[in-house]
Structure formats: C-alpha cells, structure tokens
Amino acid sequence: MKKHNVFLLSLGCSKNTVDSERLMAQAEASGITFTEEADLADTILINTCGFIEDAKEESIAEILAAVEKKTQGIVSGVYVMGCLSELYRTEMREELPEIDGFFGTRELPALLQAIGAQYRDELYDHRSLLTPPHISYLKIAEGCNRSCSFCSIPKIRGRYRSQPMEQLLREAALLQKKGVRELNLIAQDTSIYGRDLYGTPMLRELLVRLSDMEFRWIRLLYAYPLDFPLEVITAMSERKNICNYLDLPLQHCNDRILRSMNRGITKTETVRLLDTIRAANPDIRLRTTMLVGFPGETRAEFDELMQFIETMRFDRLGCFPYCHEEHAPSYALEDTVKAEEKEERRAELMELQETIAKENNQLFEGKELTVLIDQIEGDIAIARTEYDAPEVDNECYLTTGSLRVGTGEFCTAHISESSAYELHGTITAVNG
C-alpha cells in the first residue's frame, strides 16, 4: 500500500498544535511522511479553527486553496479536521464534495485510517513537535465544563476531561528527552485540573511533580478565575523553575456583563483574587484577556472596564471584539454594539494598556534578567523572560558581543532600554 506524503497545516491555538503533533507521531509510526511544502505532498490535511469569525474565514480560505491544488492535480487527497469540521461538517460536505473526509476533534483513529495509518494506544504520549525544539505545550485536559455564553468550545470539545497525571508525566519525560526546556501547561481551563479524576483539584501537585523534572521553565496558561487554586501561587514562590507568571483571562469586570457572560464571578471577587495573588507572590506577572462589545455593553460599562484596567495594571493584556458566534449561547442576545464601535473600544483599551505596559517595562531598565533565546538574527538574539509566554508576550532584543549564543540557551541579559512590548539590552553571560 502506498504511503502518503502529507502537508499538514495546523491553524488556531496551541491546543490545536498539540492535536496536530499527536497525529504526526501516530502517522509517522505507520510510515507516513510529512513535508513543509504543499506542492510536494500528495495529501493535504488541514487542522481547522472555528472559534471566532476571523478564524473560520482563515480556515475556509485554506480549505479552498487546498481544493484548488487537488483540482489542478497537484495533490490527490484533501482532509479537514478540527473545530470547524466539528461545527460545520454537514454543510461543508454538501458545499465541498472535493474534500475526501471531514473529521471532528475526537476522531483521530478514523482520520489516521483514512490516510493509510493505524492508531496505536501505546503511542498516545508521543508527539512530533511543530514548535521550536526548546519550547513545547502540555495539554493537561480536554473540553470545558464552564458555560460562558460567548463561547462554543463546550459544543466543539465536549465536557472537561483531565488527563491522568501519570500519563502527563510520561509525556513530559518524552518532551524532555527531545530537548524541551520550557513547558507550557494548557487546557481550556487549567484551574480545575484533576477534579473529575481525583475528586479534588490537583494542579499544584501536577506542577510540583513536573518541577521535579529538569525543565528550566514551567508556565501556567489559560487559568479560570473561578475556583482558581491559590496554592499554585505558593508553588511558584517555592519552586525556581515554575515561572512567576499567570495567564488568567477575565473577559470583563462589570457585574451585569459578567452575569450575562455566565462567568460565575463578580467584580469584587475578581479584585479580591488579584490582590490575594499579588500579595502571595509580589514577583508574579499577570496576563489577562478582555472582551469588548458584548451584547448590551454600554459606554458606561466600557468606561468601567477601562478604569478597572487602569487600577489593576495588568502586565500583559490581550483584547478581542465580541464575535456573534451562532453556536454560542449569547447568539440568542441582540448584537447591539456595531462592529465599528467594537473595534474603536478595542483600540482605545489597547492604547491604555500600551501606556501601562510601557511604564511596567521601564522598571526592568538597569536590571539583569534571565532570558531564553528563541532566535538569532545576525548579532542580535531575540529572547523572552520568565514573564513572557511564547508568541503572545514581550520579546527582548539583545546584542551578543563576543559571546557565542544559540537558540534554546538560557542567558543573563542587562536591560538598557524598553518600550511597551520590547526590552533591549546586552547578553552578559551564557548559562547553558
């Protein structure tokens, strides 16, 4: 039987990336090869994102481009997997008969069979990395039990399912053998890890067990404010290789909007949580995400959010305009804020955050920081501090002088200048 040469395009979030890496490891074990150029492949496989409208449009555009290559005879097979396929399989099957198969988020064995590979249980922990070799993600759970009204993830990914701790430790050990030095923990909701399996949250225990391994940085992403286990913050202080960093998407602060979003938390409770976290670990840096233009959001409610951000002074912040997603519960509400107004509010909020970020970064000037080198361009090393997650946060641009520096190395850097989203300086020592 002919073994396919596959071009895999993985779109969307880091959770999707992990799914693609699992698929690749399974397929390669069956003799499938992968290429980075679509024109050299005989099969195209697209792992889609369907979370917001822009992501859907990108996924559809890539699907149509793949269909065109099939029509031209460049490739013989096109398969679609992931979130968009989970939501719109019936519609896409009718509109795109050229596609050889559609597979949802929980159909890896069937997808492998379609491309001439076999799923093997013993390879579940194995992944072929799509990230730089020194960085990886550990997906500690699937699905989501929250009922945020703006979100379709529970419909796409199903109920919350923690991965067994021993399995995660085996997977982490394999990543360590591959040379991964920074491990980023992800899930739709990392806060309640383990509750479904062990009857109690086990996130701190997992972090400590991972900390006993040889990763230099372990980072926690996608924590949910309700039910967040504060003992995790203590672990950050106690364990040198658990980053003093927390990604805690809040979405909003106004109580009426939080109720309409079904977030399960109030503004007062949110402020208390943030104050408690910072008091327990003064060195922590907080990242959050805000959603503007939610149905019914008034100018006064948006101004309240702006004041909240100015008061809380988040170290890292992303902001998105509300997307009226037909598969989300909030689709039943009237989308009252015009698209132009949503974008104006997003820009206004990010302008405020830029000012805050610039002032926060000035505190690093004159200091020496440990950084991880992600990239080398000439005599400039592009790096991150422990306070910066891959892809979404600040970067450091550092001169190397006479020092020989490679990607994936930890170094000491003297910071001389800063801006809102960058630090500039010089590498003073290579720490290996």
Swiss-Prot record:
Entry binding sites for [4Fe-4S] cluster 2: 144, 148, 151
The EC number(s) this enzyme carries: 2.8.4.4
Cofactor note: Binds 2 [4Fe-4S] clusters. One cluster is coordinated with 3 cysteines and an exchangeable S-adenosyl-L-methionine.
GO molecular function, one term: aspartic acid methylthiotransferase activity
Recorded superkingdom: Bacteria
Pfam family, one: Radical_SAM
Family (UniProt): Belongs to the methylthiotransferase family. RimO subfamily.
Recorded catalytic activity of this chain's protein: L-aspartate(89)-[ribosomal protein uS12]-hydrogen + (sulfur carrier)-SH + AH2 + 2 S-adenosyl-L-methionine = 3-methylsulfanyl-L-aspartate(89)-[ribosomal protein uS12]-hydrogen + (sulfur carrier)-H + 5'-deoxyadenosine + L-methionine + A + S-adenosyl-L-homocysteine + 2 H(+)
Domain MTTase N-terminal: 4-120
Keyword entries, A-Z: 4Fe-4S, Cytoplasm, Iron, Iron-sulfur, Metal-binding, S-adenosyl-L-methionine, Transferase
Lineage, broadest ranks: Bacteria, Pseudomonadati, Chlorobiota, Chlorobiia, Chlorobiales
Gene Ontology biological process: tRNA modification
Name of the gene encoding the protein in the UniProt record: rimO
Name this protein carries in UniProt: Ribosomal protein uS12 methylthiotransferase RimO
